[in-house]
């Protein structure tokens, strides 16, 4: 039977006429199709230039893997958010050199510090639609694990051919639930160094209390530099390396940013869920996300308790703590907005209309009916697995996770590279090595034991038919044990392992399967014991995943065709690929507190919020040098008369999500005016349902960053390099 589909460009053409003006995270190749909307919004440059990834400005935008950055000098200097560089700041911090607290500035190139092991910059250079290669006639006829394996095999083949061009990293990304696929090629820069980060009192001002909150006063910026080998090609860290020379970099705005101005953001948004089915929405907000939030809240409290009074422990757990707090508050915001909304009712009504349309013609029913029905039962299977296994990531000791990864490396290395598990091929070994290398700088045994014992006790209290006997046996536990007895058993496991030693872990990367099986290390033994069951679960997930991919892609195709029949827009959910969103600088009336939210905050708000180191957990503790400069009204050229101060953060109608952090916010001339770093708490529900009245993104105003760098931190070298006079 012939498959009917619309290309991404065709979908964009529909969207140009029907989407909300500021809604959508657009692929660069789609932008010429929405040129009229971009021009109407205020873009001065030719929209066609935005589709060329090797031209200005897209050639200046890079992925950090979970965050975005952009080149701002010809010497590979890149700016991103402070919270995106937090892991590298933490990795280089010690109690006697507390970069987290005091900040960091490299006065010379030689002073720039290696970022955390495994840090990368990826510059997207090409995108290719490979849907027909992935979903060829043979693969379309398959289901279950066979389908999953066939898709993975084709992906590996495409990636291997793409990566024959040395120095590049290639990946295949799925769109519309596996209906369409893109092969994305990126230059991989492997030597990344920390150049500058402001003090926590600037870069994290407001802390968790102000996270997802407006008005905001956070200097969320830091600088990296990309380095390459003497031959100009990507290379591992070496003192002989030299700064990378990007073909394009962004320039600071030559004109002031004002309310109502056009802005656009280029970045790598991680994930949205706007095309999810009603049953998925119901499960997410009815059980999964509330449970995740509860568990994360408990983990946050445990980490605080176990590291209290131990600065070394606080530093080691800082990156994990930041991530937990950020996601925890995000989930809370989503839940609060969902509970007071009609999102589920609207999703059900939309799905009922889709099913009625499918059943309204014999041809459509034959084409889509089976997939629509199958998706419902398959999603129910996945939900049952999630309920049983949600605690797994929280209850597993870090050293056991490490041991399982090490043993899997040994198992996969014995196979031909093309047959190895995705993520464990030769191309992945540097990433795996870096993960093992960084563990001890982010591992605190006291805290790790407490987390494991606490959540293992919860797991063992689940109904017996939901427990995995292999997991229970690997720990030497029994159902019904209390936390104290679990802790006693864990003490034996930790004492019987040497994996907390970096040299020991790194040595295991080069050992074979026989060495693992002969080991008496407690966590290595547990990893070996769990291996067969881990593969059983992997095959279970592949079987379900293959069935679900087939059905879900069919549902997405039905959804696309249904909306196309009505002349309505459909764009792909975010999936960590390069996208552009556009909008304008705009406040909100009313805000969540009932007041009018003005589009800009200023330095006055920092002074008003400042509480010092001993109140509010030290989250509102601006540096003394900064407060003195504000009091003296030493504003220089960054003073804005209409604000009678220097702008700090601003609101816009940009459509963004996690992964956009660090993304450059550009004006109509593609000049840098800010860095995207957050959204408002009631608008995080936009990941599931877009509401133009609510959605506001929060960005750092570049004028605040430049004021802090010039007036307080005196980073003259960097300002000169960026061409700031």
Roles of regions detected by a PLM:
Residues 2-5, 10-725:
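Terminal presequence/propeptide segments associated with secretion/organelle targeting
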């Amino acid at each position: 039977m012939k498959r009917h589909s619309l290309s991404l460009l065709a979908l964009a053409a529909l969207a140009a006429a029907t989407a909300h003006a500021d809604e959508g995270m657009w692929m660069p190749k789609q932008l010429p199709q929405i040129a009229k909307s971009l021009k109407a919004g205020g873009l001065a440059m030719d929209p066609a230039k935005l589709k060329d990834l090797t031209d200005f400005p897209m050639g200046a935008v890079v992925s950090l893997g979970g965050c975005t950055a952009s080149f701002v000098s010809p010497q590979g200097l890149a700016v991103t958010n402070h919270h995106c560089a937090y892991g590298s700041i933490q990795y280089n911090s010690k109690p006697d050199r507390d970069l987290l607290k005091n900040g960091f500035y490299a006065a010379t190139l030689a002073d720039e510090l290696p970022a955390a092991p495994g840090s990368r910059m990826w510059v997207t250079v090409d995108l290719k639609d490979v849907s027909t290669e992935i979903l060829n006639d043979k693969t379309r006829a398959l289901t279950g694990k066979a389908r999953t394996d066939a898709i993975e095999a084709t992906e590996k083949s495409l990636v291997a051919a793409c990566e024959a061009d040395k120095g590049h990293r290639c990946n295949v990304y799925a769109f519309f639930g596996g209906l369409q696929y893109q092969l994305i090629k990126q230059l991989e820069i492997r030597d990344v160094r920390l150049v500058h980060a402001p003090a926590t009192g600037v870069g994290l001002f407001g802390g968790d209390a102000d996270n997802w909150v407006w008005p905001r006063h956070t200097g969320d910026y830091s600088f990296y530099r990309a380095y390459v080998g003497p031959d100009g090609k990507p290379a591992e860290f070496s003192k002989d390396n030299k700064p990378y020379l990007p073909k394009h970099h962004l320039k600071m705005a030559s004109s002031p940013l004002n309310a109502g101005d056009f802005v656009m953001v280029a970045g790598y948004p991680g994930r949205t869920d706007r095309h999810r089915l009603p049953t998925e929405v119901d499960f997410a907000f009815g059980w999964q996300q509330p449970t995740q939030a509860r568990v994360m809240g408990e983990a946050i409290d445990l980490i605080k308790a176990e590291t209290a009074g131990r600065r070394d422990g606080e530093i080691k757990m800082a990156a994990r703590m930041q991530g937990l707090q950020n996601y925890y508050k995000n989930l809370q915001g989503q839940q609060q907005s969902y509970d007071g909304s009609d999102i589920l009712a609207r999703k059900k009504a939309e799905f009922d209309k889709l099913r009625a349309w499918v059943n309204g013609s014999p041809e459509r029913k034959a084409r889509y009916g089976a997939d629509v029905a199958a998706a419902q039962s398959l999603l129910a299977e996945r939900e049952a697995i999630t309920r049983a296994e949600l605690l797994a990531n929280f209850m597993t000791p870090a050293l056991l996770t490490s041991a399982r990864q090490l043993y899997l490396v040994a198992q996969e290395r014995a196979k031909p590279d093309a047959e190895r598990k995705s993520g464990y091929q030769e191309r992945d070994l540097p990433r795996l090595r870096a993960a093992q290398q960084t563990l001890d700088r982010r591992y605190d045994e006291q805290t790790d034991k407490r987390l494991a014992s606490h959540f293992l006790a919860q797991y063992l209290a689940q109904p017996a038919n939901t427990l995995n006997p292999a997991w229970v046996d690997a720990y030497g536990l029994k159902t019904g044990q209390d936390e104290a007895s679990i802790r006693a058993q864990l003490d034996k496991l930790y004492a019987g392992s040497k994996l907390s030693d970096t040299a020991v872990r790194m040595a295991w990367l080069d050992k074979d399967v026989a060495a693992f099986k002969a080991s008496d290390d407690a966590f290595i033994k547990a990893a070996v014991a769990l291996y067969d069951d881990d593969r059983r679960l992997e095959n279970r997930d592949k079987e379900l995943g293959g069935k679900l991919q087939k059905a879900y892609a069919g549902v997405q195709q039905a959804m696309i065709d249904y909306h196309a029949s009505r002349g309505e827009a459909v764009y792909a959910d975010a999936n960590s690929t390069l996208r552009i969103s556009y909008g304008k600088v705009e406040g909100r009336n009313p805000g969540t507190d009932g007041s009018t939210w003005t589009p800009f905050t200023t330095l006055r708000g920092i002074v008003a919020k400042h509480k010092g180191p001993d109140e509010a957990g030290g989250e509102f503790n601006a540096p003394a040098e900064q407060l003195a400069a504000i009091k003296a009204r030493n504003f220089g050229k960054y003073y804005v008369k209409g604000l009678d101060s220097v702008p700090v953060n601003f609101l816009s109608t940009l459509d963004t999500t996690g992964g956009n952090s660090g993304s450059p916010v550009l004006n109509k001339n593609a000049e840098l005016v800010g860095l995207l770093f957050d959204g408002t708490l009631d608008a995080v529900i936009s990941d599931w349902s877009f509401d133009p009245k609510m959605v506001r993104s929060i960005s750092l105003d570049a004028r605040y960053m430049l004021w802090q760098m010039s007036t307080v931190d005196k980073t003259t070298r960097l300002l000169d390099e960026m061409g700031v006079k």
